[in-house]
Amino acid sequence: MRTPEILLTADKTVMINYRLTCLGGFVACVPRKSLPVPFAKLMEKRLFLPAPTNENGEAELANLFLRKVETTLLESGFDVVVCDSAYLDKFNAKVYGISTIDPFGIGPATSTMVGLSGGKEPFNKFYFEELIRKIRRERPDSIIMVGGPGVWQFDVLDGKQEELGIDCIVEGEVEEIAQDLVKKALE
């Protein structure tokens, strides 16, 4: 098991493999229990595939947010790995940086679909919370930082950061503060 200082990842709806359709990102907005179970399972199996990885479990493809943070931290001399959340068990990091787009399903597209379904939980909320809980359960002493365009949702849903055990929410251009933030987290 590799032990990098920092592991960067995202839930499977953010790291979605667009091999089958360019509209795959919209599937993350669909309420999970609004679909017939066999269709939902097939869709999850075919669309929410792990990102292509190398033999070490490191993601070969990742979103721009993760790659910008990775580059900033590598240039500062940190040991950083970007991996798909399906391969977390290959690593034991001190700091986990999570990128998110719509963590609680209240973005425009998702909230519309959730409203039409009568309020059922969307895939993006389910997988984001599952990822955070898994890291917290399996690596209780690690630091969890969350950033990305969806962090505004923590301001709207007061208490979610504490409920999920997230240590730090990063809003804004993280490249400017990443080095100092991570240095403090590692101390």
Where are these regions (language model features)?
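Detector for Asparagine
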Residues: 17, 54-56, 63, 92, ...
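A solvent-exposed, charged loop/short amphipathic helix patch at secondary-structure junctions
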Residues: 22-56, 103-127
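Short, hydrophobic/glycine-enriched beta-strand segments
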Residues: 3-14
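Iron-sulfur (Fe-S) cluster-binding modules
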Residues: 1-5, 45-47
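N-terminal [4Fe-4S]-dependent radical SAM core
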Residues: 2, 19, 58, 180-187
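Glycine-rich beta-alpha loop elements in corrinoid/cobalamin-binding modules
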Residues: 65, 76-187
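Short N-terminal binding/cap micro-motifs at the start of the first secondary-structure element
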Residues: 14-22
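Short, charged N-terminal beta->alpha structural module
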Residues: 46-76
